[in-house]
Structure formats: C-alpha cells, structure tokens
C-alpha cells in the first residue's frame, strides 16, 4: 500500500485551529438594524458567534451584499409571502422527512447561506484530502493493517468498534473504491474557521434536500440568481451514477445499477426514490432481489436480471441475514458472498463505519499524515477521548462545561450539554462515562456560526452547520459545490438535526469571475405579485408504524444522520 512514513510520531490530539486575525476575534458590537433585520438588535448569546452576513461592526460581508440589498427593503408581509411560497412548494412536491411515523415538511429558510469562491476552494481541497486518506485507511484496515502494525493508531481502537466487520474481509472492490459517497459535516467556529465535526462514510443522507432547496429557491428568488454567480448543484446524480457504473467489474460494459431502500417507511425514502429516478435506475427493496450461485438477480416483469452494483441505503446489520441480523427482511440473503466472489459491488462498502466512528474521528489527522504525508487542511473540533485515562479525568473534572457525545449516537440524540445540564443529568452522564469510556467523547462548546434566519416577522441570527457531499468515482473525488446547510431554528439551540426541530438553507457557492463552472438560473417569478394567502395548517400524512414486521425493522434514522 502506498503511504509516506513519518520520521517522528504524530500527535494523536486533534489539531488546533489556525491563528485567526485579531479583527475577527471578540463579540460583535451593537449596531442598530432597521426593518426586517431587527432581529439582530438583541443578539444575546449569538454575539459570541461568527456571523456570516455581518462582521463585528455590523457591516455586510462581501458575499452577502447582493442578498442584503434584495431583502432589506422588504416588509414583514413580503417576507411572510416568500416564506409561505417556499413551504407550499415543498408540500406540493412531497418533500418531507419522517419523524415518529409522521411525514413532516422539512423547513427551508428563505435566506441562503453564501460561500465565496476562495473559501470554497479551501474547503474542497480539505474534503478531498480527507476522503482520499480515509479511503486508504479502510483499504488497509480490511487488508494488511499496516497502520496497526506500525503502532500509529491503537489496534483496540479498531477491534472495539462495533462497525468493524470481519465479514468484510476478502471483499475487494474492482476499482478499489469503498467510499463512493461521503458526507463531511463542518462547523464554523467563533473565529470564522471551518472545522470538521463528523465524517459520514456509510449512507449519508440529505443531498435530495440540497437539490430541492435549490429548485425551490430558484422559483422564489429568480432575480437573485440572475445577479449572483451561483454554482449549480443539479448534476449530483450524474456524478453518482458515474461512480456507481465505474465501480462495476471491469468486464461489464453496461452494468445494471439499483438503489436498495428499506422501503417507504424509512425517514429518507423520498431521497432514495429521487436519486433512483434521476439516475434512471431501479429502486428496489430486499424482496425484489435474490442470490443464486453467488450472483444477485432482480425480479422484473420480464424475468430475472443480473445486478452488478447495489447502491444500498440500508445499514450493515440489515443487509444480509446470513451474515448479520438473521431476522432482517430488508436485505438479501447471500449478498456478501456474492460481493466476495466479485459478482456484485455494494456501495458504499460494508464495514465503512470503522472509518466514521466518532472515536476514530479523533485520529483522522494522524491518518492523513500517515497515508498522505500531508498536514490536514481542515482541523477537527478539539476532542477529548474518554477511553484514555488522563483525558477521561479531565472530562470528569470539567463535565459541567463540556459537550458529552455518545460515540454511537446520531440525530442529535444522547448529547449532553454540560453548561445546560442539571446536577442529576451531570451525575447520570458521569456514571455512563465511567462505565463505558470507549462509548463517549467530549468537546468544548463551539459557538456555531450564524446566518440570518426568518423568526416571526423579522430576520435574526441562528446557528448553522454544513454537510458537503463528496463522490469518488475511482479517478477523482468530486465535491458537490455547497451541500446541505442545517439551521437550529430554536432560539439559542446548537442542535441542527431535523429530528430535533432543525431546518435547512440553500447553500450558495459563488463561482469566480473566470470560472467555467455551470451557473444556476432562476425560474419564472412566482412570489412578488402573489397575494398573501390565508394561513392554514397543512395536513400531515400518517404512517402506521406497527403494520408489519418489516416496518418494525425500519432503521429509524434522522433525516440527516
């Protein structure tokens, strides 16, 4: 395996942030904002965060000047009309997520998040570097395990990870790619520095909202797209299809690709069906596939058809009842044996979870240096590992000022914010950390950056994160320009997950003046002359969560895992 040896041991601590300019430090100074930006007149705790539209003196930052000029003359009625137009468009298009068996619209805020061309170039390079290093790491872990033999990371880090699947040994992708799609979660700290919060290498969801957010915003704000060089996002599915077709065995000139879904009760089913439709491939459930002689076939109205690549949106544990959960009816019996025989490719690969485990995350800077011989271009959030004695003691001493996260948690569940926790909650999490040190990490409270967001009849700061999506086709790592910006709609909240009341924003990456990248075009205006509609609560479609064994086995993922 190609890698660069280091002359000295690399620190296992996460990297500190880059030194920031003094002009970016400190809380913002009060400045009166008129009209719809009145929500910025009482910042409260938001004054500690880096605001992406306004600098410390309240001046509008360069990438947002056009948006500010468009929105600032608006009154509350026009703001509400545009917001309702966005909401109606989502409901009309059936864009929902499932929460506790109920289909709910996914809130889209009307103020886009804007990233300059120069800033995006830095992020793109950092994401690409990270995906390449993690690809090499996974190939090594399920192969020669040189990184373990060299003592660069502890062997027990891998063997104790519940997503390290020995069943994946011997499954060698034809083009060497295990991470076909990655979602790298980023936050922007109080100094304005982007940091990696989490890696998602299994079935990262949310890209459908990126595309639908853009389509809807282009209808509601066509004039903004006409005056901004916003890079297009609609070609994601073509990049994904190319990656999946490239993943097939080299002797397959026209491989059959399918999208494997747990079914309509899964929280991300809308995304599964959208991607299948846009790629022009079949959307299948486990019952539509079967294995014979280590070959996977699809049942069709015209008979059996061999399947070459499966883009699965099912967790490993449900994928093959012969290898994992024997009670699963969501997967395909014999699928792993077929993959091991080289007759089908599973995308993303089985066992990728050993690369996005939250404890493994703390070693990714070391992994990058080991395999690539490069310094990480994107820093992690500073993280303490409770399984190391000295770091655990520090966590227990400072538990009331840290964020304590379960290593296996998702969707924002199980996180304890020390500063907001009661004595009873702190005592409970202390016991959990002591009982299972491997299961917990701790981080300082990071004031996520803020972007203006509609709150009532005004725009006010709300915290955001960002999930860019990277697609690896074996020749290149392509990063979708933008990604999913999630916003914590509840005042003061740092939790952006949709399952916890979060929403989303359209994410604009501006092209440079010399760029040849495709630009987004606005659709016909649908709002400016619209009368304000009467308010009515949209009916929600229920989902019977107990109708069958299969429903009971649906992985109840938050929309953005």
How would you name each of these model-derived features?
Residues 1-561:
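Preference for protein termini
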